[in-house]
């Protein structure tokens, strides 16, 4: 039988660890983007160094989650909640890895002495992707299902941004206005940001599940029928 008082206390602590990890990942992504915008090698290296802390926190969350499962033998609904927390943590860890990828582009450009010209479209994608991750953090902390749902719907916008950047880069290559090395960097950065968007989208689905107990298919049916409170 589950000791509900201690069980809920440990779940609260677990969620607090995830909140801390979400803050670190959001900060890392912000630093990675800023390092590239300003070609700040020191900031780029800070992102790479902070990844170890994010990875360690992810491992701690996994270990605590498995200990909770072993100690309390939770019922199916509680087990699904814990597994969702684990998925949330793993998505954060992947965003941390992608932030490192972006920071590494700064170091590569600097080492190869390639002049980086910031595309307006890439800057826009930087801003949109960072805002989605930061707002996912807000939705998680404030248990805001409506915000999570609005962010979830925004994923298509980020996908279109990535496609637009790819088209612009291809056109510049055809016109001879960009080197092959810089073109590849643009495309890889846009791809990394699109993947960050995918993981942020997962975070939103996980917030919705944690707060409503419904997967996205069930939640969307509720939105369509008017039984869910999220804005359409």
Swiss-Prot record:
Which keywords does UniProt give here? Cytoplasm, Phosphate transport, Transport
Quaternary structure and interacting proteins, as annotated: Homodimer.
Per the record, the domain of life is Bacteria
Listed SUPFAM superfamilies: PhoU-like
- A Gene Ontology BP annotation from the UniProt entry: negative regulation of phosphate transmembrane transport
Which protein family is it in?
Belongs to the PhoU family.
Question: Mostly located where?
Answer: cytoplasm
A Pfam family found in this protein is PhoU
Tell me what this protein is called.
Phosphate-specific transport system accessory protein PhoU homolog 1
Q: Name one GO molecular function term.
A: protein homodimerization activity
Question: For this UniProt entry, what's an example GO CC term?
Answer: cytoplasm
Q: Function of this protein?
A: Plays a role in the regulation of phosphate uptake.
Localization recorded for this chain is: Cytoplasm
Q: Which Gene3D superfamilies does the entry mention?
A: Phosphate transport system protein phou homolog 2, domain 2
